[in-house]
Amino acid sequence: MGFEIPEPYKWDESFQVFYEKLDEEHKQIFNAIFALCGGNNADNLKSLVDVTANHFADEEAMMKASGSYGDFDSHKKKHEDFLAVIRGLGAPVPQDKINYAKEWLVNHIKGTDFGYKGKL
């Protein structure tokens, strides 16, 4: 069982990791998934892939630089697996895959990213 998926699907303060850059990037991913719901096309899918890949690179760089986040390899693998899924999609994206992306992001932030709060 995962965390509750917000409706409407948007970032709120319950998703704060308290690193401004990462919170802003999480908002961008929420917005990209929301945009895909409203306009299921190749441009919105590309935007989702791009903002997600950029965020993962930034987050992983912060984790490595901190030297105090002990779950880096597992965290990075989750990023790689999610990117593989969304990079493998074509437009229009099936609704079950949009739902998967929504659920994955919520559960990843609250279940995994929250583990680095105060450590980066």
Curated annotation (Swiss-Prot):
PANTHER family: BACTERIOHEMERYTHRIN. Fe cation 2 binds at E59, H75, H79, H108, D113. Expressed and produced in a hematopoietic center that floats freely in the coelomic fluid before being stored in a particular hemocyte type: the granulocyte type 1. Keywords: Cadmium, Cadmium resistance, Iron, Metal-binding. This is Hemerythrin. NCBIfam families: hemeryth_dom, Hemerythrin. The keyword Metal-binding applies. May act as a buffer to control the concentration and therefore the toxicity of cadmium. Also involved in defence towards bacteria growth by acting as an iron scavenger. GO terms for biological process: response to cadmium ion. Belongs to the hemerythrin family. Disulfide bonds: none annotated. Pfam families: Hemerythrin (PF01814). InterPro entries: Haemerythrin, Haemerythrin_Fe_BS, Hemerythrin, Hemerythrin-like, Hemerythrin-like_sf, Hemerythrin_metal-bd. Fe cation 1 binds at H26, H55, E59, D113. The keyword Metal-binding applies. One of its GO terms (molecular function) is iron ion binding.
